[in-house]
Amino acid sequence: MKFSELWLREWVNPAISSETLSDQITMIGLEVDGVEAVAGQFHGVVVGEVVQCAQHPNADKLRVTKVNVGGERLLDIVCGAPNCRLGLKVAVATVGAVLPGDFKIKAAKLRGEPSEGMLCSFSELGISEDHDGIIELPIDAPLGVDLREYLKLDDKVIEISITPNRADCLSIIGVARDVAVANKMPLSEPQIEAVKPTTDAIFPIRVEATEACPRYLGRVIKNINVKAATPQWMREKLRRGGIRSIDPIVDVTNYVLLELGQPLHAFDLERLNGSITVRMAKQDEKLVLLDGTEANLSTDTLVISDEKQAVAMAGIFGGEHSGVNEETQNILLECAFFAPLAIAGRARRYGLHTDASHRYERGVDPQLQHKAIERTTQLLIDICGGEAGPIIDVTDESQLPQSATITLRREKLDRLIGHYIPDEQVGDILTHLGCKVTIQENCWQAVAPSWRFDVEIEEDLVEEVARIYGYNNIPDVPIRADLIMKKHRETDLSLQRVKTVLVDRGYQEAITYSFVDPKIQALLHPQQQALMLPNPISADMSAMRLSLLTGLLTTVVYNQNRQQNRVRLFETGLRFVPDENADQGIRQELMLGGVITGNRFEEHWSLEKQSVDFFDMKGDLEAVLELTGKLSKISFRADVNPALHPGQSAGIYLENEYIGYIGVVHPELERKLDLNGRTVVFEVLWNKLASRVVPDAKEISRFPSNRRDIAIVVPENVAVEDVLAECKKVGVNHIVGINLFDVYCGKGVAEGHKSLAISFILQDTARTLEEEEIAATINKCVAVLKQRFQASLRD
């Protein structure tokens, strides 16, 4: 937005320089993008009047004039401007004047005729780029007055960038309010009084779309002179605001737009049929706009219509059919509040962007319309004459925005700003901003003014106090933090440590969605009911996962479809299990899961291709379990899992408590999920592994160890794990290592049995074991195994 500094100072005039004022405007949140002088540097240019104008005898395009500048004699000046004529008030650069670019005016002869100065155009004075002709000043401009003083050219145009929430500052009054508060000064508003009707003329108005248009005001003004000249002061303010002067009616509505921030529109009353209706556009309805283009209206576009057709696009652009022209005598002046959501995006849809739509999209003061229509009416009558009728007011109060009561707590204010601002000063700032403030204990109750519709929550009030108090007035305080070492128990096992082990073993971490395809999940967990989402992203993401397995297997398929056949992934994340006894009926548990498929090793010329199997995954998992120090207490037991191969899977138990599973994916599931080749998975409850057993340091024996091997035959259904556990119990004092190194079934072993080859490492920390002691320990183990498992030594 652009505006004149002098115009702003008519409303509030702090005793500060232009530079300081610009900095202040920026610091209160209205960023100044640029400041430019209204005119170039020149002097010696005065107001004059052309009293004689004749054709140059020696040039077709030049005129010889005599110009009165209020001195003792008339000046002879040769001029080539096409609009030079008798009686015109002009800007005269007299002899000795210096124009922009250090151009000095001297007496000279042009084609034989003397010229004692120059009649200037706007471009020659650096005021604008208009060089079509010389400046035409009002007929009442006083002769001989310095042009800089008359046009108030010692002024600057300030351009500010307005954030979308500060639509109230798309006007002089909005900027002036903030400047006044920042300088603790009163606002000098112009007196706006109600215009008494001098005619009973009215025009019927009906609002159908009350939600989109809660308030619509109309006023008939008759016998208006549309050919009257817009005052120079108004044209200059418009020009400095970036708006071109068109005619007095448009100029006045644009002036009030810049002054108060309220868009208005004038219809030619004689070109309206019957009545005005504010409604949504009809299907396939068209409207020819003021610029001559035709818009094909969509049904969500708000329009102003008469009894025959749409006559304007509400809040965006007027229609050609009802537009004011040189023949207009009677007008209907419109001033309305359109809801931002009813206007937002519509202008861009039709390739338009107008000052009105820019403001309506962001919001205007819903209580401003009466004030704006009275201001516009008075200016129109002062400039164009006419007779004003009464205001027709169609308002639905229930649809108008209402200001909320907001509580600002002292604790919240101090915490967010980081600086104490006295209570009295906080109250003054809010009051001067237009809020209705009630002071309570340690807080303020504030109702924002109607023009500050962006102030809705407590943080908004904190921002208002901070920016008016001045960010520069908030002292810089170095950031302080107490560096307290986090307590770390030696028994805690870091999840990051586990991830590092898996990465070192060739795995990559995956992060999959907690939302999964319920159909795939049902294949993996047919007996469990999942939590379904009421508003899912899509049908294949409509269930909360019961395990990490669904996401991991889906990721494997995704990679295999992209020629990545060797896949090793792990993931940590929550699973969501419906449980009536859990908080809010959902049990959330952190899980650790993994999956491998493809070759055991990366492809290499010296290695044969070997597919991964159950024991590859078991080895990787045992590397993780080793970190807990509980590996000796963890057992793998044959178990039934519908997602896993019945002969190549196991449940994982910690001291008889189930904590997870491991196994090869069931062949039937491999087919249904389009998995390519054997796929092995595991999943364990992380909270069961998150603590570790701190190892006890023991003295390394200086005495020799002894190895003894035995081969025993046991029934085929006996678990090796149980055999080894019994041996450990027997030889707890001397056996320091037990290892299964061979399993054999076949010739020499009875059917339904298997041969287990077990090695024992025996050692004592205090002495060398005698052969008799070693033999006694081994014999005792064999005896226990015979009794417990019907084992026998193999021949």
From Swiss-Prot:
Family: Belongs to the phenylalanyl-tRNA synthetase beta subunit family. Type 1 subfamily.
Transport is among the record's keywords: no
Cellular localization per UniProt: Cytoplasm
Leader sequence segment: none
Gene3D superfamilies: 3.30.56.10, Bira Bifunctional Protein, Domain 2 (3.30.930.10), Ferrodoxin-fold anticodon-binding domain (3.30.70.380), Nucleic acid-binding proteins (2.40.50.140), Phenylalanyl-trna Synthetase, Chain B, domain 3 (3.50.40.10)
Enzyme Commission (EC) number: 6.1.1.20
Entry protein name: Phenylalanine--tRNA ligase beta subunit
Organism name: Photorhabdus laumondii subsp. laumondii (strain DSM 15139 / CIP 105565 / TT01)
